[in-house]
Amino acid sequence: MKNILVVITTAFVPTGGLTTVMMNYYRMMNKEEVKIDFASTNNPPQVLLDEIHASGSEYYQLSDRKNVLAYFFALKKLCRGYDAIHVHANSAMAVMELQAAIWAGIKIRIIHNHSSRSQHNLLNQLFLSLYRRSFTQAVACSDEAGEWLYGKNGFI
């Protein structure tokens, strides 16, 4: 059985588009072949936690990303023992999650971009080069989102 950690850097809420799509995929997966655990910085509603736990998965609440070092090292520790990480994010700032996974020895690092712009353009540009070298597979919710963060090629 493969162990996958899904990290959500945006809000993990039942009515959000990202959560809806992600949970639809999760519900369809064969949980005898793959164990998927979730982590985010917010406290999701009990209805989501109940569904996750009822399916044999775990949820981990991470500290705020604003405390960069504490967040990074806690995530690195959590990543140990997982075969893959799938990070849902909106910018190259997800380099923190990807680098924590690298430091923890995770070989498969999937990034999933959900936006075509960033609120932090300067930081996005600053981290973009390292970010693009930190994932093994890239996914985007649209061509526009993919081209904005990954360039013209190399994403699905």
Question: PLM ranges: what are they?
Answer:
Residues 1-156:
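Membrane-interface segments of envelope glycosyltransferases acting on lipid-linked substrates or membrane lipids
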